Amino acid sequence: LDIYGARIEITTTEPCFAAPIAGLADDSDISDCIIKDTYVSLTDSAKMWGTGGIAGFGSGNLDNITTDVTLVCVDTDAAVRDEQFMGGAYAAGFLNIRNCSITIDGYDSDHGYVHDGGLVGMYMVYPLELSKTYQGEVLNNKVKGMITFFEDNTDRRAYCQANMGEVMNWTYAYSGFTSDFKRNETYDYSVTLLPEMCSNPSYSDTVTEATAADFGYTTHTCSTCGYT
């Protein structure tokens, strides 16, 4: 399965996980995919929510997947101390990740607790009984990119790492991880963080024609800021 140029934009007040393949992955196997030039944006005011580059929340296996995704989380209720998750592979849960190449451009504006990771926002095994015996695998993965975020909260967590934002259960084999990742925290809480920050963007279009082996696509480039 290859996904090119998907655009997912969700606005809700309910708990929600958004991702290109599965918002909820329940003991799911996802393998040998390419997810390219894909944009996932979730605007929410719920207590728990997030975005992922492959899957949202859950369990299972991710193998041999290449991604190039833009992820956006916008928290719209400053009074709620929410738990927000963003991950280049998945937002939260305990999926195994093996031989995956993740490119992430993340933007997270949150007034609660941030859990952001180049691979996983938060690694957590559930239910509790399973967490006592479960042995997972996070092997031979690479991450490239940046997550720009703010956490507008005096009781701060601000979890953001190249691999996993927060780890609740250290119950997995881990090796072969490489990264070229930037943790970019900002402190102007009045400005919602988005990939396109121009108030009046001006776009030029470049068409790449389809071939027998590849899909065609159009690249839109802002002449003001260079965003594509």
What residues fall within each predicted segment?
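Extracellular modular ligand-binding repeats in secreted and cell-surface proteins
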Residues: 196-228
